[in-house]
Amino acid sequence: MKLLEERILKDGHILDDNILKVDSFLTHQVDFSLMREIGKVFAEKFAATGITKVVTIEASGIAPAVFTAEALNVPMIFAKKAKNITMNEGILTAQVYSFTKQVTSTVSIAGKFLSPEDKVLIIDDFLANGQAAKGLIQIIEQAGATVQAIGIVIEKSFQDGRDLLEKAGYPVLSLARLDRFENGQVVFKEADL
């Protein structure tokens, strides 16, 4: 997605040779017009697959996921990273390791929001090692629902997340694919769209 790649080049910052900071439009402050365009692109790509729910993980996946759900006219569910006293029955959980934060969290979704009839589109802000998506897949499958595809805003193609997910049989669509960081600049790999 050319618009996203241009924004990454303009406002993204490389940290430690393997982390891209995009807090000015995605991971802290949100550019809603860009997120709306991202949502439309994902919705157009997956409209024919019968998606009934969009699922993400808090926090930075929420903006692109909610705009995708809006464009598809389906509910969006986000997995919570912290235990909540109001979520006390029928909770579906998985362990997720965060590459950026270097911690493992138990993420959860109330089971009442997913059913075996659901066809789910996972949306996330980044794909690095695939652990967030893997955890969401585990939760979705605990409910008996089906993962139709995984939509990623920014993929770090130099890490093994995509390979892990595709080998497990899940289609992955990334709007921006980072090939590498070179001389303080992002070098893109051809995106899926």
Swiss-Prot record:
It holds the Pfam family Pribosyltran. It is found in: Cytoplasm. Keywords: Cytoplasm, Glycosyltransferase, Purine salvage, Transferase. It is an enzyme of class 2 (transferase). Xanthine binds at L20, T27, K156. 5-phospho-alpha-D-ribose 1-diphosphate binds at A128, N129, G130, Q131, A132. One of its GO terms (cellular component) is cytoplasm. One of its GO terms (molecular function) is xanthine phosphoribosyltransferase activity. InterPro entries: PRibTrfase_dom, PRTase-like, Pur/Pyrimidine_PRTase, Xanthine_PRibTrfase. GO terms for biological process: purine ribonucleoside salvage; xanthine metabolic process; XMP salvage. Pathway: Purine metabolism; XMP biosynthesis via salvage pathway; XMP from xanthine: step 1/1. The keyword Glycosyltransferase applies. CDD domains: PRTases_typeI (cd06223). Its EC number is 2.4.2.22. It catalyses: XMP + diphosphate = xanthine + 5-phospho-alpha-D-ribose 1-diphosphate. Its main location: cytoplasm. Converts the preformed base xanthine, a product of nucleic acid breakdown, to xanthosine 5'-monophosphate (XMP), so it can be reused for RNA or DNA synthesis. Belongs to the purine/pyrimidine phosphoribosyltransferase family. Xpt subfamily. Homodimer. HAMAP family: XPRTase. This is Xanthine phosphoribosyltransferase. It comes from Streptococcus pneumoniae serotype 2 (strain D39 / NCTC 7466). The lineage of its organism: Bacteria, Bacillati, Bacillota, Bacilli, Lactobacillales. The gene is xpt.
